[in-house]
A protein has these predicted regions:
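Classical Sec-dependent N-terminal signal peptides that target proteins to the secretory pathway
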Residues: 1-30
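Residue-level hotspots at or immediately adjacent to binding/recognition sites across diverse folds
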Residues: 23-332
């Protein structure tokens, strides 16, 4: 998919200029962003605060962030706040069937059976919880200092410690296994959520690839993608089929003048668009970066002035959130 301009219809919703393509467009260039539905909102919050994660839940989007913020976001970009008396920063949120679990700093875990009323449950840790993933009705969370949390219902948790050098910053799962990553370039994998193998990417690929600081991992049924930065601050994106052999993707693209350039901006979030068979990165400086199956067809698009932190794709909608609790909505 790309944002290929076909025919545009302009209209106003709630004071926001929105653009809708008459057909289903494709993601190709920054200039063509307006071929998709686009709306952006900001809050009055400070520059350092914002949303940290977002999911699709019950026909709407649910985002979490600093100060315990939990907001529903509609496909038009309007938000509705969920009451939450706990002000810990929430780093991640996940749902399974009707239940919703949000987690974050100092080991906080909030549980909801309906997405409206959230109750604090005992996590058994005071470490920052950074990511969660469901598989086979088992919920696994990753936290600082090698802490793994495990739950069958989202309310009762047990923990174990992994001998890793870094903090577990992200976890994802498919039908086969969980994979997590640390901010020291380590990759952890488990088939049952209890027993984990640990690999040090930086050590194994020393001399072949630059050392990496990992940020997010995303699993689909046949691909695994890790995003982060190299030690020199340049962006890094790794692909694997089974998690055993990793290939770094070249992040080159053609700018609006047709000049070949390389992405220099840090990626923070990732989603998969199955209809377009593309991974889309949410990056600093309001940039989206598309990684289609064609490795020479990457696309750079700037949609905001804010650093983007999280992104999710649901049907025709791409919702991106970031600093200052900004919301960007794109309709393909």
């Amino acid at each position: 998919m790309s944002f290929l301009l076909t025919r545009i219809v302009n209209f106003i919703i709630g004071g926001l200029m929105c653009l809708v393509s008459a057909g289903r467009p494709f993601f190709t260039s920054a200039e063509d962003l307006h071929s998709g539905y686009y709306a952006q909102q900001k809050s009055e919050a400070g520059n350092t605060k914002g949303y940290r994660d977002i999911i699709f839940y019950n026909g709407k989007f649910l985002a979490v962030g600093n100060d315990g913020k939990i907001d529903y976001i509609s496909s038009s970009g309007e938000r509705a706040q969920v009451n939450n008396s706990y002000k810990n920063t929430l780093n991640c949120i996940i749902s399974s069937y009707q239940i919703v679990v949000a987690a974050g700093d100092n080991g906080i875990i909030l549980f909801s059976s309906d997405g409206q009323i959230f109750t604090k449950v005992e996590s058994g840790t005071d470490k920052n919880i950074n990511g969660m993933a469901f598989r086979n009705d088992l919920l696994v969370a990753g936290a600082d200092k090698g802490t793994i949390l495990i739950s069958k219902n989202g309310e009762t948790w047990s923990s174990k410690h992994l001998e890793v050098k870094g903090n577990i910053v992200s976890i994802s799962a498919n039908d086969s296994y969980w994979i997590g990553i640390t901010d020291r370039g380590e990759i952890i994998r488990s088939y049952d959520g209890l027993n984990w193998e640990i690999k040090d990417y930086n050590k194994e690929y020393s001399g072949y690839s630059k050392s990496c600081i990992f940020k997010k991992v995303l699993l689909t049924e046949n691909r695994i993608v890790i995003i982060g930065t190299h030690d020199d601050g340049s962006p890094a994106v790794l692909f694997s089929t089974l998690g055993n052999v990793w290939t770094e993707r070249l992040l080159i693209y053609h700018d609006d003048q047709g000049i070949i350039r390389s992405l220099t901006i840090k990626p923070n979030g990732i989603t998969y668009d199955p209809a377009g068979d593309q991974f889309i990165l949410a990056c600093d400086n309001g940039v989206l970066f598309s990684l289609p199956s064609c490795t020479k067809c990457n696309v750079f698009s700037k949609i905001s002035t804010n650093n983007l932190s999280a992104i999710t794709c649901a049907g025709d909608y791409l919702i991106v959130v970031g600093e200052e609790f900004s919301i960007s909505v794109v309709r393909f």
